[in-house]
Amino acid sequence: MQPQYKFFAFISYNSHDIAWGKRLQRKLEGYRMSATLCSEHGWQRKPINPIFFAPSDIQPGGLTEELQERLKTSRHLIVICSPHSARSEWVGKEIEYFHQLGRTKNIHFFIVDGEPHSGNPDTECFNPIVETLGLPEILGANVHEQIFRWSWLNKERAYVQLISKLLGVEFDAIWQRHKRLLYSKIIAWTLGILGILSTLTSVYIINQPTDVKVMLNET
């Protein structure tokens, strides 16, 4: 029988990366999966719920009994990786504790700054506990990985990469649909803006004196 968890995932982070934590929680909890995949796997349309993130639930700090309980009742651990979190004692303790629970395969890394395995404390993004525990080779989702020309699309790809790992589905199974939805939104926004500009231009012409209207129409 599968264990029941209160939280789908626990986000571990350093306070310098709090904005990324909030953004990630919002992205994951709000992600709508396709009806086809939901039907195949028995998911809800928003399957990654709820996410435990300290600012909205409890003040971060030491690895208190309360935080330990939240880790115990979380199916996955998501570590926001940056040079700040790499130097954080408490991020290391949260990783170590989750590892001790026997859920190492459910530890996921989301890289927002720095470089993996750089060997330089100023740029290294993985906490040293990762090497100390001998965790398997890690390829975290990296928001700065240059796959596309546009940085916002690289970030979206990293979000979907993490989502695919959390749900245990092929990346392409959800990425292609996600891209189509993004492009559809961009087209809709562009058409909406053009429509507004066209309306404003028409209103401007209507409100001009007659001789100005004639000049505008002639041009």
Model segments located where?
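A short, polar/charged loop/turn motif at coil->beta-strand junctions and beta-hairpin connectors
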Residues: 5, 45-47, 210
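An anion/phosphate-binding loop that grips the pyrophosphate of nucleotide cofactors and donors
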Residues: 74
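C-terminal interaction surface of TIR/SEFIR-family domains
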Residues: 1-29, 50, 56-70, 83-89, ...
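Inter-motif core of Ras-like GTPase G domains
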Residues: 77-79
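Ser/Thr/Pro/Gly-rich low-complexity linker/stalk segments immediately outside membranes or between
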Residues: 205-219
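Residue-level signal for threonine
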Residues: 44, 82, 88, 217-218
